[in-house]
Swiss-Prot record:
UniProtKB keywords: Chlorophyll, Chloroplast, Chromophore, Magnesium, Membrane, Metal-binding, Phosphoprotein, Photosynthesis, Photosystem I, Photosystem II, Plastid, Thylakoid, Transmembrane, Transmembrane helix
Cofactor binding, note field: Binds at least 14 chlorophylls (8 Chl-a and 6 Chl-b) and carotenoids such as lutein and neoxanthin.
Functional summary from the UniProt entry: The light-harvesting complex (LHC) functions as a light receptor, it captures and delivers excitation energy to photosystems with which it is closely associated.
Protein's UniProt name: Caroteno-chlorophyll a-c-binding protein
Lineage of origin: Eukaryota, Sar, Alveolata, Dinophyceae, Amphidiniales
Length: 102
């Protein structure tokens, strides 16, 4: 039912391996498409954050004074989640939830 929608292209055609659109609901399909666009835009902004830091350098000072984490510390992955105080993580999650609901 969605073979003629925007983004469907050869040679794959309509691609939904997990069956999110199996119910055939056009409203559900449009909501999923909008969600995919939002997530793509957030990912692009995150990538620009990495590029900006490489070009301009990182801020002086502490990201988390209580844990001794500076802005220029190189912390990646799960270790980054452990080092940041819970209030900071809640702030990130609330901000992302607000973006998702907008």
């Amino acid at each position: 039912x969605f073979e003629n929608e925007r983004g469907v292209a050869d040679p794959v055609g309509f691609f939904d391996p997990l069956g999110f659109t199996a119910d055939g609901s056009v409203e559900n399909f449009k909501k999923l498409a909008q969600t995919e666009i939002k997530h793509g835009r957030v990912a692009m902004l995150a990538t620009m954050g990495y590029i900006t830091q490489e070009i301009t350098g990182k801020l002086p000072g502490y990201l988390s004074p209580s844990t001794g984490v500076k802005y220029d510390d190189d912390i990646n992955g799960v270790l980054g989640l452990i080092k940041i105080v819970p209030a900071g993580l809640w702030g990130i999650m609330i901000f992302y939830a607000a973006l998702s609901l907008a």
